[in-house]
């Protein structure tokens, strides 16, 4: 293996690379690194690189058993936000589609939104550290 870098990469299968790029750049402040649409593009936010692979990309080719990679599911990237209520309000006003409402647990608050292909993005606001 190569040495780890500062950048972390995650691949998402998408139905439409251009729609996916528009979603991540418009709603979540990612920046385009490269685009070979309609097959592939990659976008970045901080040290997260998201590889967006369409049906015509090499990552979209069927496996030897015939299984085709598909978008969607429940695996997701997890983005930390400072004020989840304000972020959700901003995104709802902009038309971002959410799967649920804000949930709160001992670790903090979270909500799920989805990109145009159904891939999930989790927004998470950590709980305040307990006072000792």
What are these regions (language model features)?
Residues 1-9, 31-80, 88-114, 125-132:
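Vicinal oxygen chelate
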Residues 13:
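Catalytic core of Fe(II)/2-oxoglutarate
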Residues 20-25, 91, 118:
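Conserved active-site tyrosine of GNAT-family acetyltransferases
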Residues 120-123:
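Short glycine-/small-residue motifs
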